[in-house]
């Protein structure tokens, strides 16, 4: 009976009026902002995470120790706290110099930067695990044949590591789209902030939040569909390798497959492995 009473009190006319048509709704703009922040923050997190992962697997303590400390801080503190520190605490700590104005005076920039820095800490471990999962014997063989370290990384290690890195990376894209809701605490006009603005004006709390939930579901469904397509493509690549079929020209160009490495010196007689 209570559930029926709750359902009866739900204002469907308000819900559908706000939800449709979407081009008349501020939620559409907020949803676009969520996608934009997600794309920028996650991509920046991947790039920074790759750099940090190289430091993480380095044997040089000058590279490894700072990365360990970075991961300790960003993985050990709440994301919401980091957002508040970046937007509100940084200005007080530094005296708000002009150079920090783009961060301390723009909530979108501060929020996106914090999300990227936080995500880099998690992408570091994902990328590190992928890089270290590649058979060390392949790396040793390539080095023994005279391939430069950079070529070994980008022609042998990275293409194989991507099969491990890509699935959790797209999960991180989906998580990032939901983490943008935390930016409502610093007045970034994303979906949750837009819903809060609506229900402070018309007092339809549940209906306003329900509209935001629908938009979040649309965004996560869209990202999930992309994830499945990319994972399917990686599955096809694996089948091609097993079947011995040649890779398409664009793929050979990206990975360097089938190209002669000029850094390799000497020849190896047939049936003999050069070590």
Q: Residue ranges of each PLM-predicted region?
A:
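Transmembrane alpha-helices and adjacent helix-loop boundaries
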Residues: 1-275
């Amino acid at each position: 009976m209570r559930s029926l009473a709750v359902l009866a009190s739900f204002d469907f006319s308000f819900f559908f009026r706000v939800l449709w048509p979407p081009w008349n709704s501020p939620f559409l703009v907020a949803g676009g902002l969520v996608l934009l922040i997600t794309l920028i923050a996650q991509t920046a997190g991947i790039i920074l995470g790759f750099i940090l992962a190289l430091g993480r697997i380095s044997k040089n303590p000058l590279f490894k120790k700072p990365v360990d400390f970075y991961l300790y801080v960003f993985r050990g503190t709440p994301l919401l706290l980091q957002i508040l520190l970046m937007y509100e605490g940084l200005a007080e700590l530094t005296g708000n110099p002009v150079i920090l104005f783009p961060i301390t005076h723009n909530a979108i920039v501060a929020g996106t930067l914090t999300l990227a820095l936080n995500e880099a800490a998690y992408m570091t471990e994902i990328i590190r695990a992928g890089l270290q999962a590649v058979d060390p014997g392949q790396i040793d063989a390539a080095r023994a044949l005279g391939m430069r370290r950079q070529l070994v990384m980008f022609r042998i290690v990275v293409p194989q590591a991507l099969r491990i890195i890509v699935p959790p990376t797209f999960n991180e894209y989906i998580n990032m789209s939901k983490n943008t809701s935390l930016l409502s605490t610093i007045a970034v006009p994303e979906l949750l902030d837009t819903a809060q603005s609506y229900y402070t004006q018309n007092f339809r709390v549940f209906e306003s939040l329900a509209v935001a939930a629908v938009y979040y579901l649309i965004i996560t469904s869209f990202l999930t569909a992309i994830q499945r397509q990319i994972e399917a493509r990686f599955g096809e690549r694996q089948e091609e390798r097993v079947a011995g079929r040649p890779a398409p020209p664009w793929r050979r160009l990206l990975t360097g497959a089938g190209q002669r490495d000029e850094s390799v010196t000497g020849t190896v007689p047939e049936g003999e492995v050069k070590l």
